[in-house]
Amino acid sequence: MATNIRKTHPLLKIINHALVDLPAPSNISAWWNFGSLLVLCLAVQILTGLFLAMHYTADISLAFSSVIHICRDVNYGWLIRNIHANGASLFFICIYLHIARGLYYGSYLLKETWNIGVILLFLLMATAFVGYVLPWGQMSFWGATVITNLLSAFPYIGDTLVQWIWGGFSIDNATLTRFFAFHFLLPFLIIALTMLHFLFLHETGSNNPLGLNSDMDKIPFHPYFTYKDILGFFTMTLFLGALVLFLPNLLGDAENFIPANPLVTPPHIKPEWYFLFAYAILRSIPNKLGGVLALLFSILMLLLVPFLHTSKQRTNTFRPLTQLLFWTLVANTIILTWIGGQPVEQPFIFIGQIASITYFSLFLIITPFISWCENKILSLN
């Protein structure tokens, strides 16, 4: 019998085991589509970013003008720029839904995969932050000033650290050039970690909505899940296309149409929408160092989730009380996102503080306790 090159060639064999003959649980739902959508987002961002980098100039006197030049004079430059800007938003929508699915279905119990995923989230946030500075508009400049200044809260080394990142005594040309270098470099680091994420996932196999061992009920990845993923690709492309062509500035900030001016502070300094929940947590603590630590722990909290899992069941599928807590967390995060975009005044300060306490309580106290209670209820005869 003739051997199949797909199964024998050293390189094709790896691709075959990852994308063609990979045994996958038969019951994984559309919530498992977001991994492949994130890979598509990454590919789109790297391609559009590469073409933008060909025309962008990382200099404070030319950066803003070079972005205008891209939009006005470069063939389809406006389209490439809008895809890149809105693609970032879509990237975060997909990663937040991907994380939410992991929390709901207990995927965090695959510890190595989960931990690399959290590192990937940090890298994505860093990439988006330095990228937001590059157009050198008002919100780019002041957003960078506020966020980098937070590092000065660290005792003893804070001020030195801030000046080291700035490359001087204020945000200037050195800052912009290094941020451009980081923005170009970090996506390649994301690719490397994504491959590690895959590697560890394929060591254990995917989780499924029931949270049970699915070894006795596996189906090949191709054609079943390749077609399912392609449907996801089309849906996402349609959504991104509609956003880019009809509402390209919906998720941006109007302040960024004004060139950066160190002498004029915008009335409300705020980051992009996907950072607002963490920004609200930062602002809800009156102490600077406390706020910075709360900001860090709002994301680092995800690393603790596997150790706070007290339930005998893996997923939330058959746990109505924990389901209620999960959707409370989702609603709470949406409230934090809304608060992060509001001015620092009452009642927003108070709502933000309540939402921040609720956010940490749900992770650290309420969910583990309710899971323990559910175990007790299940053990009653």
Swiss-Prot record:
Q: Does the keyword Glycosyltransferase apply?
A: no
Q: How is the cofactor bound?
A: Binds 2 heme b groups non-covalently.
- Name its species: Heterodontus francisci
Q: Which cofactor does it need?
A: heme b
Q: Kindly report the protein's main subcellular placement as a broad class.
A: mitochondrion
Enumerate the residues binding a ubiquinone: H202
Transmembrane spans: 34-54, 78-99, 114-134, 179-199, 227-247, 289-309, 321-341, 348-368
The protein's matches in CDD domains, at most eight in alphabetical order, are given as: cytochrome_b_C, Cytochrome_b_N
Instruction: Identify one Pfam family in the record.
Output: Cytochrome_B
SUPFAM superfamilies according to UniProt? a domain/subunit of cytochrome bc1 complex (Ubiquinol-cytochrome c reductase), Transmembrane di-heme cytochromes
Annotated membrane topology: Multi-pass membrane protein
Q: Name the encoding gene, please.
A: mt-cyb
To which protein family does this belong? Answer: Belongs to the cytochrome b family.
Q: Which UniProt keywords apply?
A: Electron transport, Heme, Iron, Membrane, Metal-binding, Mitochondrion, Mitochondrion inner membrane, Respiratory chain, Transmembrane, Transmembrane helix, Transport, Ubiquinone
GO terms, molecular function: metal ion binding; ubiquinol-cytochrome-c reductase activity
InterPro entries cross-referenced by the UniProt entry:
Cyt_b/b6_C (IPR005798), Cyt_b/b6_C_sf (IPR036150), Cyt_b/b6_N (IPR005797), Cytb/b6-like_sf (IPR027387), Cytochrome_b (IPR030689), Cytochrome_b_C_euk/bac (IPR048260), Cytochrome_b_N_euk/bac (IPR048259), Di-haem_cyt_TM (IPR016174)
Q: Where in the cell is it found?
A: Mitochondrion inner membrane
Its function, per the record, reads: Component of the ubiquinol-cytochrome c reductase complex (complex III or cytochrome b-c1 complex) that is part of the mitochondrial respiratory chain. The b-c1 complex mediates electron transfer from ubiquinol to cytochrome c. Contributes to the generation of a proton gradient across the mitochondrial membrane that is then used for ATP synthesis.
**Miscellaneous remark of the record:** Heme 1 (or BL or b562) is low-potential and absorbs at about 562 nm, and heme 2 (or BH or b566) is high-potential and absorbs at about 566 nm.
Q: Which residues bind heme b b562?
A: H84, H183
Gene Ontology BP, a term: mitochondrial electron transport, ubiquinol to cytochrome c
State a GO cellular component annotated for this protein. mitochondrial inner membrane
Identification of the protein by name: Cytochrome b
